[in-house]
Amino acid sequence: MARRRSTRRALVETPSDLNAQDSDSLSVSTKEELGDDALAAEEGQSVLDEQEIEEALEEDDTNYEEDIIDDEESAQVDEEELEEEEEEEEDATPEPVVTSKKNSRSKPKNGGASKRKASRRTVVDEDSENLEGDEEDGSFSDLKDLYSNPMPAQTTPVSMRMTKRQRAIQGILEEGEEDELLELPPETSGRKKLTPEEMALRRIENARRRKNQSERRLEEEKMETINRLLKRQSNTGKPRRGRAPNNPTSDSISRSKAVPKDRINMYQPFQCVRFKSTKEGSSLGVPEPLIRFFS
């Protein structure tokens, strides 16, 4: 329909342009000379041109309708051939189907090659769009399945994430890999596990040690009490300070007969030098013990 309207516009516009050129070419003097006859001739010519345009448009419409009918018939034939081919070959891809459509169509008739080529292109474009839509639907469905199904927690094997020593301990060796690692003792740290006999011997030893410690503690306490009692007895034999003993001995008698010594006064004044300066004169006072230092 769009092509039909464009052809009509082109055909309608061409005579008006011709008339405009003719009218421009005619000078004013010739129009005055010809007068009414020239105007009537121009009007008749324009009417004839319009009739020719309408006839050409009608012919184009009839040709276009014939082309459409031919295209529909060829499309039906192509559909039948495609159905037969699909029944014969179930594993055929969509691409050869499109090529068969192009090749199976009959040659155009009545000179409508360009329009039929355009219709073929539209059919092929529709098929390609349908195929692209199917592919997009398939990709969307694949994405939905991918997101709906949970991913496994461990995509890589466990042996790939272990060290060489860990694999050797568990006995997992790769191709061409030799077990050259030294195996450490299983219990390098921690307490040693004892047998029941060793446990019984250890308990007996601990009981013996506790018994010896208690006996030693008792002996020490006994010795402390004995020393304390002996110390008290030795203190009771001594006279108290300031009192004479009840039984005078030879030592006490000799002490009483001894001459008493003079008691030394422990108080000593502060030793200092005194300097005195008056109108009569100055003087220096020095204590007796310090005179030898100033002589």
UniProtKB/Swiss-Prot annotation:
Basic residues bias spans: 102-120
Biological process, per Gene Ontology: CENP-A containing chromatin assembly; DNA repair; DNA repair-dependent chromatin remodeling; transcription initiation-coupled chromatin remodeling
Polar residues biased stretches: 16-29, 246-255
Phosphoserine PTM sites in chain numbering: 128
GO cellular component labels: Ino80 complex; nucleus
Signal peptide span: none
UniProt biased composition (Acidic residues): 49-93, 125-139
Chain positions covered by the region annotation Disordered: 1-265
Phosphoprotein recorded as keyword: yes
Ranges of biased composition (kind: Basic and acidic residues): 194-225
Primary location: nucleus
InterPro entries cross-referenced by the UniProt entry: INO80B/Ies2 (IPR029523), INO80B_C (IPR006880)
Location of this chain's protein in the cell: Nucleus
Keywords: Chromatin regulator, DNA damage, DNA repair, DNA-binding, Nucleus, Phosphoprotein, Transcription, Transcription regulation
Keyword DNA repair recorded: yes
GO molecular function: DNA binding
PANTHER family the record matches: INO80 COMPLEX SUBUNIT B
Function: Component of the INO80 complex which remodels chromatin by shifting nucleosomes and is involved in DNA repair.
Recorded family membership: Belongs to the IES2 family.
Subunit structure: Component of the INO80 chromatin remodeling complex.
Protein name: INO80 complex subunit 2
Source organism (scientific name): Schizosaccharomyces pombe (strain 972 / ATCC 24843) (Fission yeast)
